[in-house]
Structures are given as C-alpha cells and as structure tokens.
A protein has these predicted regions:
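Hydrophobic residues in well-ordered beta-strands that form the structural core
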Residues: 60-62, 103, 146, 179, ...
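Histidine-acidic metal/acid-base catalytic patches
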Residues: 1-27, 98-100, 157-179, 184-283
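Residue-level detector of anion-binding/catalytic polar loops
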Residues: 32-33, 59, 100, 143, ...
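Active-site-adjacent beta->alpha loops and helix N-cap segments on the catalytic face
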Residues: 42-52
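A short acidic, helix-capping loop that chelates divalent metal ions and anchors anionic groups
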Residues: 69-74, 110-116, 153, 186, ...
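Active-site-proximal loop/turn and secondary-structure-junction residues that shape catalytic pockets
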Residues: 10-12, 38-40, 66-69, 106-110, ...
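Active-site acidic/histidine proton-transfer and metal-coordination neighborhood
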Residues: 55, 77-176, 261-265
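Catalytic domains of carbohydrate-active enzymes, especially glycoside hydrolases
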Residues: 20-40, 90, 96-100
Length: 283
C-alpha cells in the first residue's frame, strides 16, 4: 500500500516545536509521514523537527511557494535569481527536516497574473531556474514535484498537459510532477486522462476535497481518482492537504475565509478513507 501523509498546514504554516504533540497524534492515527510548508523559520527549527520526526519513525515531505518578488517567470533576471536563491534555501530546509520531496507550485508566482495565457518563453524561463535549482537539490537527493494549480491561483500550469510541458522544459531527472485532486477537479476533464498524461513523471499526490475539507465528504469523484492511480501503478505518497483558519495569515493568502472541517476530523476520517479506497482499488 502507498504511504499516507498529512500536511500540517491544517494547523499552521510555521515549523516549530508547537507541532510536536500534533505530530505524535498523527503518528498514533497511523500516518507514515507528515508534510511541512517551507516558511521563513530558522534552520534550527527545521533541524529540531527533523530529529523529532526521525525519532518517532515518521518520514517527511515538504511544500513551498514563490511570489511576485521571487517569480521564476519574471522578465527580470534579478527576480529570477531571487527565485533560484529561495528554492536553494528551501532545499537546505528540506534537508534539515529529512525530506526527499519538495512539492508545490514554485514554478511561478502564486496569484501573479499578466492578463494573457502563458507563453513558451515563460516555460523556458521557469525551466532554466528549476534546472539550476535541481542541480543543487540532487546533491541532497531531493526531488521537486511541481504542482499545477487552478486558474484562479496560477496561469502557467493549470493542467497536467501544461505541467508535463514544464517538466520537459526543466529537463532534469530531479524535476518531476505532482497531482492534486482539488485543482484537477476544477481543471481536468477526467482524472484518468490527466493521470495517464502525467504518469511518466509523477512523484507525489495530494488528496484534497473540492472544499478543502475532509476527503470523501465532498464532490470529488474518488473512485475515479483511486482507480486511475491504480491503473498507472502509482507507488508514491498519498498526502492529505486540507486547510483551515487556524493560521490566519496563511489562510488569507490562499483565500480560506471559513472553516471547512475540524483538522482532527480531516486527519482521522481522511486516513480511514484513503486506506479504504486504496484497498478497494488495489492501490
């Protein structure tokens, strides 16, 4: 069975010792690992977290974003250099916490739009930054799992077809892709077609309901999602990503204006749901 993870953004975007009791409880539920947002905390906070999760017997994955001032598709070479520097910094923090995967939409600035569709030059610019960053990540055996977002958050990569184009532009074995059921539920015609498209470079999966609440409680076609993952013989992480207003600054940044589900309801029922669906579909 695939490893099951939980993204602690349901509680906070900050990596700190305050997460220790939450992570212990997630371990008790049965999770194989936890996922952290790579925010501006000191290296020592990540190192303590890395030691703590290792001692608990939990693996880790990480997620990051970039914005207007460190946008890999900016026309400004200075801004693109800041993007490269930030991704390298994230690699160091991921290494501190023992993560071998950095996922997320760090190919372009989150909610940065230019009032036109993406152009080939922008894929080339992002690919250049990601290729250089991946050379650095490879030294720590870290893989990038790039994420396509819905049209309201990103214009460079909304679909698996666009994401595959970006991965090819980066042209590096450590640059791969991820699949998020929330975004794909908005942008793709069918999960099966989307997953067949991205299968050759798929490295990570986020299990996320249409309303960002408890998986299985909403409108996502979960049988299609899990059967399609089984059809491509996916063997990576199945990590729940759900949000709340527990961290107001982060919630405001991603447009979370109300509570969807209690985080522990998400964690407990979501874990059971993933196991049931995985067994049902032979994943």
């Amino acid at each position: 069975m695939n490893k099951i993870g939980f993204n602690v953004l349901a509680w906070t975007a900050a990596v700190s010792d305050d997460l220790f009791p939450i992570i212990e409880r997630l371990k008790g539920i049965g999770y194989d690992g936890v996922e952290f947002y790579l925010g501006p905390q000191e290296a020592s906070a990540y190192q303590r977290m890395g030691n703590f999760t290792k001692d608990l017997g939990l693996e880790t994955t990480t997620v990051m974003t970039v914005g207007k001032d460190d946008n890999p598709v900016s026309e400004s070479a200075e801004v693109r250099q800041r993007a490269l520097d930030k991704i390298k910094w994230a690699v160091d923090r991921a290494h501190d916490v023992n993560s071998k995967i950095i996922c997320g939409p760090f190919h372009s600035g989150h909610t940065v739009f230019v009032n036109r569709p993406a152009e080939d030059r922008e894929y080339a610019l992002a690919g250049e930054v990601l290729n250089a960053a991946a050379d650095y990540a490879a030294q720590a055996n870290i893989t990038f799992a790039l994420e396509a977002l819905n049209r309201f958050e990103c214009y460079l990569c909304n679909t698996m077809e666009q994401l595959l184009k970006l991965v090819k532009a980066a042209d590096h074995p450590n640059v791969r892709a991820m699949f998020d059921t929330h975004h794909s539920n908005i942008e793709e015609k069918k999960f099966s077609t989307a997953l067949q498209t991205i299968a050759p470079v798929l490295a990570h999966v986020h299990i996320s309901e249409n309303d960002r609440g408890t998986p299985g409680d909403g409108q996502v076609l979960w049988d299609d999602a899990f059967s399609s993952l089984a059809a491509i013989k996916y063997q990576g992480w199945l990590t729940i990503e759900a949000f709340s207003r527990n961290d107001p600054a982060f919630a405001n940044a991603i447009g979370v204006w109300r509570e969807f589900s209690d985080p522990w309801d998400i964690a407990e029922n979501g874990y059971r749901f993933i196991r049931e669906m995985s067994l049902k579909h032979g994943l």
